Amino acid sequence: MMKQYQLWYDAPAKDWNIALPLGNGRMGAMVFGGTVLERISLNEDSCWYGGFRDRVNPDAKKYLPVVRQLLKEDRIAEAQQLAEEALTATPDGERHYEVLCDLILQQLDGETPEGLHGMRNLRGQDMSRHERPVSGYRRALDITDGVHQVSYVRKEKQIRRECFLSVPHQVFAMHHEGFSSRVLLRRGAYVNRIDKVDEHTILLSGQAGDGGVQYMAMCRAVGEGVHVIGNTLHIGETADIYLASATSYRFADLRAACLSRLETATADGYAAVKAAHVAEHRAVMARCTLALHGEDALDNLPTDQRLARYAQGNADNGLEELYFAFGRYLLAGCSRPGTLPANLQGIWNDDFHPAWDGKYTININTEMNYWCAEVCNLSEMHLPLFDHLRRMQPHGAQVALGMYGANGWVAHHNTDLWGDCAPQDTYCPATYWPMGAAWLCLHIAEHYRYTLDADFLRANYDLMTGAADFFLDTAILREDGMYTVSPSSSPENVYI
């Protein structure tokens, strides 16, 4: 029988970093488990700011031989200055990942509710200021089933919520038991509409900045007392809540895409949606386990207390098992067949301009995301990376020709939603490193070694040969008979 691995806590999350993650590859959610105000921070993998731009520096090909000669003569400072001017892309930055929206559940427990003005943008807030006295509090993420649960007693009333992100139905689903509540959709910027769709459905829509994708989140509730006033959805003491999302990256008609998913989920009903989700998720998690035979009694400690205890040097084999399972859970949550690959934050992001833009940092971070894919029996979770290599390849061919006068294709240390392969930033230890495509192509070989899927290898072999062709054209034969790549770097290392 498979062990039920859980992360659990005896208090709500006060900030985004200690909320608990759900994911179905395309959508992500961070659940806070609030007592009066439940915040669920939502992401959609294709919600990015801006469209594709050809950023190749028009002077790159002209000055590349000069940079190489300066490096050969050990005139490093001069080479760096010229590279910054001639090889840096114009502009120097790719596009960045964004937030989808917040789903907010505000319980109406007889006290004067906080005004809606305070709900406009919860990003970055200390959520503990919204909490109220409760007893018996517990929030838990069941990694084995992929379900988040929170329970507590408030004003002598038992409150229970559970939620998950479904792969089969492609929706976020929640079951609520507690006080009557109002349900809100909010986003801090780039919002065009927050509208009533019908008496049990609301939507939020907009565009992720100038040239960015158009996005939509649509939320529907089922249960007694459900109604909409303005753009606020009201639910009774017991209700099922579903949320679907779509962007123009995949769909021409976002409203129709969201409605279709909501109609299917509500027609099937919460019990069936949950059963399908749990069956699919458990099958993934059951493929690989790590047994270190920890002390079962330690499972009764909240996870944050176990981590503190472990940090003090106390053994906890069960915690190591738990985090092994959690690592597999996270990859399955942010990378599924047909989705975009895991980005710098997997899929979970609470910022309109996240650290390093939340892109794909391909001078080790993206590779690290997928190092566990094959060996931990998550082989199909690797596929989004190969799909993205296919998106990158034509842009990488343009960069190879435009910057280097070379055949094949090249990528530098970052790429984005559109597969941009031109250099990113003006940071000498990383920007001019040209081995991103070649390194990522090693993952094609790794996938083949584990699957022996000859059709897959045939379909992707040209990506590998194209990455090799670039170096056949650009590798420089030194006087000692060795080949070198110039300019390049050991990623993010500097001269001392």
Stretch-by-stretch model annotation:
Residues 474-496:
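Aromatic-lined, polymer-binding surfaces characteristic
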Residues 1-429, 435, 444-448, 461, ...:
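Aromatic-residue-lined binding/catalytic grooves and analogous aromatic/hydrophobic interfacial grooves
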Residues 456-460:
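Membrane-interfacial loop-to-helix junctions in multi-pass inner-membrane proteins
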